[in-house]
UniProtKB/Swiss-Prot annotation:
Record's keyword terms, sorted: Amino-acid biosynthesis, Cytoplasm, Isomerase, Lysine biosynthesis
Protein's gene: dapF
PANTHER family associated with the record: DIAMINOPIMELATE EPIMERASE, DIAMINOPIMELATE EPIMERASE, CHLOROPLASTIC
Keyword Isomerase listed: yes
NCBIfam families: DapF
Subunit structure, interactors included: Homodimer.
Pfam families, A to Z: DAP_epimerase
Protein name according to UniProt: Diaminopimelate epimerase
Localisation per UniProt entry: Cytoplasm
Residues at the active site: C76, C224
Length: 293
């Protein structure tokens, strides 16, 4: 028996990042990695956002985040905007606080209808915090490349943690590389003991960046909020952009502000509802064929 048996779920997306949200605040029983993989086989998603009973006073819920391969993630900005949209529906509150593995996240209604802002917290730059498998005194750009030594295909990424590890490769054209091929190689590179999210980014000007991401545990994605935050922060660290930038992702636009007053990163963007459903218990007992045959 699974904690997800017969549970109502909402299928949503955050500018193309496929999200499933399930409210389990009345259900303390754990959801397993096998459960998360079973859901992905029938309701394809990038992240599964599970609202579990609040652990801390003043928070709405503890949000557990699964990738579609059954691994857990500490943060998912696009998913948190979807959670915020669901929780703000029918509520008069203007702000909500959630607990995640990465810490507390605050969410607000955005500057316009359909937009939501998430405070993603402070970025981390120390090699142990990202983490990396070996010491780098300066993580603004590290020695890492893929391809021939004298003509690398991708090289010298910036590395940042926004609750999960990110590597950003600076390129002239984000569509000129086979990220579906290089992404898994770099995600699983030995330098990243917890694997990493891999982003290709092009700085258009001081207020605009375009990017594509191979998401750890999920693969190619139309949008990754924590990657957008990491990319914006990494560019600002290199003095190549301002601290507020517009990010263009395959799925749409995000506004990222790296706030100077407290070092927090704010992400603003949309969240769309697609449909609701209930999980068939047979999904978790193995009675349903994942192929649909």
């Amino acid at each position: 028996m699974s904690a997800l048996d017969n549970r109502l779920f909402a299928k949503m997306n955050g500018i193309g990042n496929e999200i499933v949200v399930v409210d389990l605040r009345d259900q303390p029983a754990p959801v397993t990695p096998a459960d998360a993989r079973a859901v992905a086989a029938h309701v394809p998603y990038d992240q599964l956002m599970l609202l579990q009973p609040a652990r801390l006073s003043g928070t709405e819920a503890f949000v557990r985040i699964y990738n579609n391969d059954g691994s857990e993630s500490g943060a998912c900005g696009n998913g948190m905007r979807c959670v915020a949209r669901q929780m703000f529906s029918g509520s008069e509150k203007n702000g909500l606080t959630f607990e995640t593995r990465a810490g507390l996240l605050n969410c607000w209604r955005g500057p316009a209808d359909g937009l939501y802002t998430v405070d993603m917290g402070e970025p981390k730059f120390g090699w142990q915090d990202i983490p990396l498998a070996e010491e780098f005194r300066d993580t603004r750009m590290i020695e890492l490349q893929i391809g021939p030594i004298d003509a690398p295909v991708l090289h010298t990424p910036s590395v940042v943690s926004m609750g999960n590890p990110h590597a950003i490769f600076w390129v002239d054209d984000v569509n000129a590389y086979d990220l579906g091929r290089f992404g898994p190689l770099l995600e699983n590179h030995p330098i990243f003991p917890e694997r990493a999210n891999i982003t290709l980014a092009h700085i258009v000007d001081r207020q605009h960046i375009t990017m594509r991401t191979w998401e750890r545990g999920a693969g190619l994605t139309k949008a990754c909020g924590s990657a957008a935050c990491s990319t914006a922060v990494a560019a600002a660290r290199l003095k190549r952009t301002d601290r507020t930038v517009e990010m263009t992702l395959p799925g749409g636009q995000l506004t990222i502000e790296w706030r100077e007053s407290d070092n927090h990163v704010l992400m603003t963007g949309g969240a769309a509802f697609e449909f609701e459903g209930r999980f068939d218990p047979a999904l978790f007992s193995g009675a349903l064929d994942p192929t649909g045959a």
